[in-house]
Amino acid sequence: PVNIYVIMADQGPAHLPVSLAVHTDMLEYVPVSKDEYFQKLKKA
C-alpha cells in the first residue's frame, strides 16, 4: 500500500479524524509527528 503521512498537530488527539482514517487497498494514512515526518523525508 502507499503510505500517506499525515502530520499531527502538536497538541490534540493522537489518532486521525474519522474523515481521514480511510483505508483502501492502495492508501493508508499514517499519523506521524513533524519530527518523524522529516526523518522519513531524509531517508527517502
Swiss-Prot record:
Key word Metal-binding present: no
The keyword Cytoplasm is assigned to this record: yes
Compartment(s) of residence: Nucleus, Nuclear pore complex; Cytoplasm
GO biological process: mRNA transport; protein transport
Signal peptide positions (record): none
GO cellular component, one term: cytosol
Keywords associated with the record: Cytoplasm, mRNA transport, Nuclear pore complex, Nucleus, Protein transport, Translocation, Transport
Domain of life: Eukaryota
Function, in words: Functions as a component of the nuclear pore complex (NPC). Involved in poly(A)+ RNA transport.
Assembly information from the UniProt record: Part of the nuclear pore complex (NPC). Forms part of the NUP160 subcomplex in the nuclear pore which is composed of nup160, nup133, nup107, Nup96 and sec13p. Nup85 may also be present. This complex plays a role in RNA export and in tethering Nup98 and nup153 to the nucleus.
Protein's name in the database: Nuclear pore complex protein Nup160
Organism: Xenopus laevis
